[in-house]
C-alpha cells in the first residue's frame, strides 16, 4: 500500500542521510594538520598496512579527518567485552539474565571502553603527528586539539551507528564499515585502469583480479547461504494440536559467526602495525619498523597471525553467541527432541559436535577468502588494497541488509493487513 511504501521510504531516507553525514564527516580535517606532508606520507605508503588502515577509515586517515579512527576503538572495546563476558560468570549473568536492563549495561560498558581506547589511540596519533612534523604548529595545543577532534569523531560515529540500529535497518556499525570500504572503490578502479593504460599494470592481470573477485563473491554468497539442518521432532501432547506432532529442524549455518572474526582479526593486526607505522621513525624505535614490515600483507608472520586470529574468533564467537546448552534447553522446554538422541546432555553434546565441525569448515573458508585474494593482489602489484577481508565484509553486510529489508517489508505488509482486518471488523 501507499502507507507502507511511504514508511519504508522514510526508513531508507534516514539510512541514506546517516551515510551522507558520515561521508561528509570524513572530509572535515583536524585543525592544524599540514595537508601537503600528509599527502606525501600516504603516497609513499600505498599498498602497505597504512593503506589498509586508510581503507577501513574510508579515506578519512589520508585526509587526517576527525573520523580518522573510524569505529576501530568501538570494535576493540566490543572484543574486550566479549572476552570478559565469556570468562566472567557474574558479567555473563548480568548481561543475559537481566533482559533489556542487562543489554543497556553492556552497551554502556562498551561505550565507556570505546571512549578510553579512543583517547589512548588519539594521543598516540597526535603525538606522532606532532613529533614527525605533520602539524603546522606542533606542540601541546595541537596535541590537545587533535585528541579532542579524533575522540569526538569516533564517539559521533558510534552514536550514528546506534541511531541506524534504532531508526533504520541493519547493523549501523557494519554499514559504516561497509561504506568505508566501498567509498574508495571508484577512484581505486580508475587508478588501476589508468595504470593499465600507461603500461604500469598488465591488463591481463587486472582482468584476472576482477574475475577472481567475481568468483570470490559467488563463493561467499554460496557458503553464507549453506545450512546443516538438524531434524527436530515434537511429542504430540494434545491430539488437537497437530503442530506438536510434526517434525521441524534447527538450521545451523556453515559460517555461524558471520563477518565478526574478520573484523576482529583485522582490528587486532592493524592496531600494533599502525603504532609501528607512526613511531618507527623515532630515535631508538627502529625495531618498530621491522615489526611493521613483518606484519605487512603477504608476509609469513602476517599470514600466520591473521589465520590464527580468524580461526580463534570463529570458534570463540560461535560459542558465545550460539551456546549448544541454550539450544538444547530451548528444545527441551518446547517439547522437542532429536531422533535417536536423549534430551539434555546427549542433545547438547551432539549439537556441540555438529557446530564444531561446521565451524572448522567455516574458519577454513574465511581464511581462504581473506588471504588468497590478497596474495593475488600482492603478486599482481595492484596499486590499491581490496583484499578478501574487505570483500567478505562488503558481501556479508549487503546480504544481511537485504534480508532485513525483506523482513521489514513483510512486517509492514502484515501490520497493514491486520489494520484492514480490524477496521472491517469494527464496521460490522
Locate predicted features.
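Positively charged, low-complexity/disordered segments
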Residues: 1-8
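N-terminal cationic and glycine-rich segments that engage phosphates or anionic surfaces
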Residues: 9-428
